[in-house]
């Protein structure tokens, strides 16, 4: 196995696996394929996304060398962003709800993030604190839930990877929805290739 130059090198080569056992147990006529997007340092689907969002911002000049990065996230994107910031030389500040378990906070800190705790865990309240924090530290606020770089990553990476692996075999793509970035980017890419493919 070759030595990787960075942990991102394998993030962009997520495997697609045929689930023959699942299809057999449920007597399905169709094949079921699974896109396994967990090859990065945090073991989540957000590693490549976080790195790419920072790269896009740097290309535009909105993220400059050494500039702090802020996000309101206590989940997988926050963890991935902390690692991406650590590897690119950006301080990472994460706004998290007070309800977040201490162990989760400690993990984010171990990944290099500074934690700002919000007593109100609503998305609106955390976004407001993140905006204030970004202004205070002259930082770049990634705005994961509303940043167009989120679906753009999936147009450029996830959609093409799925299509390259499955090709003409795709009849439908089933996607879980969180921020909406994956389903938006993948759907737009795949529908442009074949408008008959169903997005579920």
Give the location of each predicted region:
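PLP-dependent amino-acid enzyme catalytic core
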Residues: 1-200
């Amino acid at each position: 196995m070759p030595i990787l130059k960075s942990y991102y090198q394998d993030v962009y080569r997520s495997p697609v696996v045929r689930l023959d056992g699942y299809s057999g147990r449920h007597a399905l006529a169709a094949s079921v394929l699974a896109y396994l997007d967990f090859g990065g340092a945090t073991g989540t689907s957000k590693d490549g996304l976080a790195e790419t969002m920072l790269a896009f911002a740097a290309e535009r000049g909105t993220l400059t060398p050494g500039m702090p990065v802020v996000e309101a996230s206590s989940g997988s994107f926050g963890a991935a962003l902390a690692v991406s910031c650590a590897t690119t030389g950006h301080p990472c500040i994460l706004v998290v709800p007070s309800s977040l378990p201490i162990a989760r906070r400690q993990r984010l800190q171990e990944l290099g993030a500074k934690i700002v705790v919000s007593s109100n865990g609503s998305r609106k309240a955390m976004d407001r604190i993140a905006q204030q924090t970004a202004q205070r530290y002259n930082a770049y606020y990634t705005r994961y839930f509303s940043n167009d770089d989120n679906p753009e990553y999936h147009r450029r990476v996830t959609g093409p990877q799925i299509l390259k692996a499955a090709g003409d075999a795709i009849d439908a793509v089933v996607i879980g929805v969180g921020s909406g970035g994956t389903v938006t980017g993948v759907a737009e890419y795949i529908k442009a290739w074949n408008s008959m493919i169903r997005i579920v």
